[in-house]
Amino acid sequence: MGYNKLTSLSANIKAIETAVAIHSQGRTATQEEKQVLAQYSGFGGIKDVLDLGTDKPLDKGVAGLLNRLLDALRTLAGGDEAACRSLVESIKSSVLTAFYTPQFLIDAVAAQIHKTFSANGLQMQSFLEPSAGIGGFLPVAMPGTRSYAFEKDTITGLVLSLLHEDATTVTAGFETIGT
């Protein structure tokens, strides 16, 4: 099955709406909510979001979805227009910088890491995912490992923190580590 931007956009918006609800209620995500959050794939390649917050007419095929997205961002921003604009800009900048890592690649890397650690009698004590997205590589960490995740995009960072509450999540670029 090929990539369908409308399906991806719809899943992203549903995940964001779910994340906003969880965040506003100040609680952790249920397993069912985590399944919804896990469908979030970011906005890499979904250029339609570049029209968010502009006077440009929205494409009829995505107008309803983009309006839902804007509503969710306004809710997350708590009515603060500057905060909402910042969230919109964060999403727009991710169009060119967000990348999806397929599960088969994550599985291959995980298998090699575990094989190398086992073969050499090593024990993982901490695990860093420097450009986390929604934390696809975090499950690579072995039991008892402290996990740290950096994610630059604000919305993706929120989804990440709700999916992996056991990891220390930093919503900032990896280049800020130690500052």
Question: How would you label these PLM feature ranges?
Answer:
Residues 1-179:
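Class I S-adenosyl-L-methionine-dependent methyltransferase catalytic core
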